[in-house]
């Protein structure tokens, strides 16, 4: 049998007794200082619930399924998703600057189809992946034209734009945006974009809004962006 010892949160005394309940949670009263409180404070319970919500968001669960699993209100889950849409800290370099100058990196680029609201409203996810470390170093959402790709290219750090070979498929937007002397377009089946295509599959397994035939789709671009950001951040953290 396991016995749990509780102490007063104010004076630290072990002489406490049960004193009713509040919203289904047992209360206690300290016989030394007469302080009343909960054995498990609400902040601790909410922190555990929010940690569970954050874990479920990165495991292909919809908002309503998380409500059924955790009992957390759907509006609270939506607030957690919007909070996760804040800018992420930059990825730390895995090698020194001197080592980066000696050896060129290899980046793989690809685009991933998704939709917002209805299937006719297409939104493409553009990814930039380091081949050696298999981490996502850049991404953006938009159409399949040149504008989102140009925005993504300009947002990449300078050492990626100057000292990298760029392997892509033969989609026409890449040839118009990427530098010709760095760009290496490859036909389907060549295997030069196998890493980024495998990461596309991993993201579809982790993020429900990227699944082709799913009821877990986003109704707004802001929520769509936030859900994808959660999936990408969690993927990079697992490397």
Where are these regions (language model features)?
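Residue-level recognition of single "structural anchor" positions
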Residues: 1-239
